[in-house]
Amino acid sequence: MKPEWLTNLHETVTAEGGAVRVTIIRADGSAPRGVGSAMTVGRAVFTGTIGGGALELTALLAARDLLDGYVAVTEPQWRREVRDFPLGPALGQCCGGFVQLLFETVGEAELRDVPVASSKDMLLARPIKSGQPWRFATHRKDDQEAWPLGVRSHVRKCLSGTRGRDAVLNSDWFIEPVNAPVQALFVYGAGHVGRAVVKTFADF
């Protein structure tokens, strides 16, 4: 499988020399999008969304500020920042909740650790502090001894099917499915209208 966001990340870094991946790692109360929503920001383009509005614009500008100060390196650095965003009057956002965003700078050196394609059930795990690369797991025994116990347990349960594969913050690590979870859609009625509806939604 070739997730769109991985393709976009590779294309942006290749074309522009660097990108920032912005991910919602915590969302309390009313928020425009949930945990795991993300966007890839380049100097000229961005893809994905964290919900639009003032939050997304502020995050977009912050990501481009990081890119302005980015200098290409030969060895991967995996620079990360976590920023808090109360969604109130100060931000000009009326949701009233609270969001925590993870900013990760990815250059050509970091991109060497990132696959282009993935298996259906692949998970991505990494600490929210700088330094360590993205870790990908496709089997319940792909966890590593250096990972916190809670992270290892979560990855194993997700990949064995005993726990849902929702994005989660665990022991200061963020774990998310590489491929967006497939949502079931039940259509009652098998006539021409029902078939047309199924055909329309098949690509979503």
Residue ranges and their predicted role:
Residues 1-204:
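Segments forming oxygen-rich coordination pockets for charged ligands
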